[in-house]
């Protein structure tokens, strides 16, 4: 299957939510990893209690894989899990694990609980959880919240679960780390001398952008370290989706935010996706046969992305060259180990 099989569906001018661009369900039907092919697999989705994470769980549950979702609100997660599981009663029920990504100790506890319940098996880690730009605040661990939640907590979880990914890989299906990032990375590179953007002059948009750049750099460095061990990392931009809870830190309702942003950037009305379309790229990253054995790629619009040729216009696809800076990736990895209290990879 071609890596650009969905490109034609994105070439013509998009018509907004619910247009002809593919949904996660369509991607799954096209790949058809149903029944016994996936019944032996374990998938863990962070931020799986709402939005793109919940939609990914809903679609991937149809494969017959064992699905775990992580989230802060255990009650909300249990309802999502019950609703999805009831729609596919012949498949293993979805399980919920509580994890608050604003607290590193909660990440450690969540990892321990997952490994206990899964028996140490993990074929796909989908790092989906995150928050949007928000007023400055620090976590109890002393890190700026957007950086901690969007990047550092995920880095720690990846370190704790990497051995399970390695142990679970097979020649037929290499284990995958799927990192949900954002086109917002194009607004700023990281500053290796100042990861923690706190204090006077704090810019929430820059903090968000840097956290997303950091996530991509992490995925690329993971690929360099684990690719030859049969585990591959892919990062991606799901697109502009305003109906998810990632925007909970912004004022107003989704409708009022949509109206406000449409005025600021008219292209949003064309490029915005609904949740079903927004989850398509991360589901593709999980099930695509054409991505087997591949990693270190940045995906966008259900295809391998190209360099952005336009300034601004973050609703449009593409990446900035700084996501491929290996020196920054190596330094970020080493610095992150220190920040989360690990001397070396487990």
From Swiss-Prot:
PANTHER family: NAD(P)-BINDING ROSSMANN-FOLD SUPERFAMILY PROTEIN, RETINOL DEHYDROGENASE. Pathway: Secondary metabolite biosynthesis. GO terms for molecular function: oxidoreductase activity. Induction: Expression is induced in complex medium (Czapek yeast autolysate medium) supporting calbistrin production. Oxidoreductase; part of the gene cluster that mediates the biosynthesis of calbistrin A and related compounds. Calbistrin A is a secondary metabolite with an interesting structure that was recently found to have bioactivity against leukemia cells. It consists of two polyketides linked by an ester bond: a bicyclic decalin containing polyketide and a linear 12 carbon dioic acid structure. The polyketide synthase calA is probably responsible for forming the decalin moiety. Calbistrin A has been reported to possess a number of interesting bioactivities including antifungal active against Candida albicans and cytotoxic toward both healthy and leukemic human cells. Pfam families: adh_short (PF00106). Belongs to the short-chain dehydrogenases/reductases (SDR) family. Residues 11-33 are annotated as: Disordered. NADP(+) binds at residues 52, 76, 100, 128, 208, 212, 241. The active site is at 181 (proton donor), 208 (proton acceptor), 212 (lowers pka of active site tyr). This is Oxidoreductase calI. Residues 18-32 have a biased composition (Basic and acidic residues). Its EC number is 1.-.-.-. InterPro entries: NAD(P)-bd_dom_sf, SDR_fam. It comes from the Eukaryota. Keywords: NADP, Oxidoreductase.
